[in-house]
Every structure is written in structure tokens, then in C-alpha cells.
């Protein structure tokens, strides 16, 4: 994990990413905390983005939580990876997370806007029930366009 620190030179960071490809337990790359913190998040997102849908699927909730703040390192890498994901696999978890966030909409307003970006995943977008799709489409159009 030390090699992934953004304070390292690019060669060391690339070596860290390369070595991480052999790590089987990828939950270590889901926004690690102390002692590494945000300094490694961008490279962790790069590592996760290279993983298969099958490898990532147990961590949908954590990946969606990464979208809570667009300023967090690696957020756009995670967004772009989720847009490419098999939407059918993501549908149930995405719907649950969005409905949970809507229960406290005022507190989760920005996160819901960020989650709306995943409507660009056409399989996911098509699979949403009409009501949820319309709510998120309105957010998408007001935030991303």
C-alpha cells in the first residue's frame, strides 16, 4: 500500500498498481483509512477499475458510497468504471442505495446528484422502475448537463 501514496514518484506508484493486480482480496483498496487515507485513494480506484464485474460485485455499496464526494480522490475513476458495469448486476444494489439516500434527501442531496451520473449506464437506466428513473433523471439533467 505504501507504493500507492501520491507522494511517491510515478514509477513507484505504477509499481504499486502493478503489484496490486495480484492481490485477491480487493476490499483493501476500498478507500483505506489510517495510516494511508486519501493519499492512496486515486491509485486504489485505478486498481479497482481494472477488476472484473464479478470481482467488484460484492462491493457495490462501498463503490457507490465512494460517490458521496466528487472531491475525493478516485471518484471519477469509480464513476466511469460503474458506467461500464453490467447494469443488470448493479440494479438491485443501486436501487436500494438510492431509496435509502432518498429517505434523508436533504442530507444526501449531493450524493443523489452524483449517483444520477450512473444513468449513463444504459442497462442500469433501462432496468430502473419508472418512478426512480424519473427522480434520478431530473437530478442528472439539473446537475450534469
Predicted feature residues:
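Structural detector for internal amphipathic alpha-helices that build alpha-solenoid repeat scaffolds
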Residues: 10-22, 41-54, 65-69, 73-85, ...
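Eukaryotic acidic, Ser/Thr-rich intrinsically disordered low-complexity regions
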Residues: 2-4, 11, 22, 112-145
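Short terminal alpha-helical segments
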Residues: 1-26, 34, 38
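Amphipathic alpha-helical scaffolding segments comprising HEAT/armadillo-like alpha-solenoid repeats
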Residues: 1-2, 22-33, 53-65, 87-99, ...
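Short, intrinsically disordered/low-complexity patches at protein termini
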Residues: 98-100, 114-115
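Short coil turns that connect the paired helices of HEAT/ARM alpha-solenoid repeats
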Residues: 3-8, 33-39, 65-73, 100-106, ...
Amino acid at each position: 500500500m505504501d507504493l500507492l501514496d501520491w507522494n511517491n514518484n510515478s514509477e513507484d506508484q505504477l509499481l504499486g498498481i502493478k503489484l496490486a493486480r495480484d492481490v485477491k482480496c480487493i476490499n483493501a483498496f476500498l478507500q483505506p483509512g489510517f495510516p494511508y487515507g486519501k493519499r492512496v485513494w486515486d491509485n486504489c480506484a485505478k486498481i479497482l477499475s481494472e477488476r472484473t464485474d464479478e470481482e467488484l460485485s460484492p462491493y457495490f455499496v462501498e463503490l457507490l458510497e465512494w460517490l458521496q464526494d466528487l472531491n475525493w480522490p478516485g471518484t471519477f475513476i469509480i464513476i466511469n468504471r460503474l458506467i461500464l458495469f453490467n447494469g443488470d448486476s448493479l440494479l438491485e444494489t443501486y436501487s436500494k442505495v438510492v431509496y435509502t439516500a432518498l429517505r434523508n434527501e436533504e442530507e444526501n442531496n449531493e450524493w443523489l446528484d452524483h449517483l444520477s451520473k450512473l444513468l449513463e449506464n444504459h442497462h442500469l437506466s433501462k432496468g430502473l422502475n419508472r418512478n426512480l428513473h424519473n427522480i434520478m433523471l431530473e437530478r442528472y439533467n439539473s446537475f450534469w448537463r
